[in-house]
Amino acid sequence: MKNIISLISKLKRKDKNFNKYLRRNSTLSESEIVQLSYDFQSGEYIKRYNPELVRKNLTPVIDEINKTTNIKTLLDFGSGELTSFSYVLEKLFKSDIKFYACDISFNRLFLGSLLLEKKKLLNSSINLFCNDFDKLPFFDNSIDVIITNHSIEPNKSNAEKIILELYRVARKKLILQEPNYDIACESGKKRMMSNNYVVNLSQILKKNGFQFEIIKTKYNFNDLNPSSLYVIKKNTRVKKNCKFICTESMKNLSHVKNFYFSKETGIVYPILNNITIFNKKFFFFKKSI
């Protein structure tokens, strides 16, 4: 792993595409490649943060959230540096909602937490956690609404696993804002294939018998990567308590100061800078400070 980190540091200085290079020149799994790529890019989204562009991009998501009644819990999956999540908070902050945001990259969440502090958006209703790509520390049917914003996009091989996990945890609705290969131009389709993006979301949803609709969006950050909202309705009447659980035993955790632990497995989940760590392979790079 030291060799990989050294190599990516050199690639960064040469402004190379980490994800593409590692897919071609390493034996790392897709989830490891995605995590390392985002870890080393941490801070780039905050540097380019433009509130007006974020507003345009997320307005359809907010509109869809507001169509859902009696929301008590919301998860932003693959929240990165929390730039989009901060807008969601600003629009819904006065509501009685308990918010969760997660990402595979601790470094991105760490920088995002500083952004939320700067915006005075951090409080006890917000829970940040670093997760494994396809494991969420929640009971079935425990989160009312789950949203994504291009976070399934780079996980082509694992897209179905991720969607099934999101569906397991969701109670009312999934709102996935993800690339729509079917409406992309030829150049866009080639770009999606070259970048190893998910191109078959509709087929995955149909295969699993989900009730869903596709809503085209008017604005895209990149016209070569057009997105749509994939709105999956669940509306189960069963509701479990929304609290962190052990991702191995799927049972309750005990909370002691700055960590959670499982009595069944003995696994400890530390809390760093108000971010609970469920990802066993997380890294922290000094450059994030």
Regions found by a protein language model. Give the residues of each.
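Conserved beta-strand signature within the Rossmann-like core of class I S-adenosyl-L-methionine
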Residues: 171-180
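Short conserved loop adjoining the S-adenosyl-L-methionine
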Residues: 135-140
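A short, conserved alpha-helix within the catalytic core of class I
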Residues: 154-165
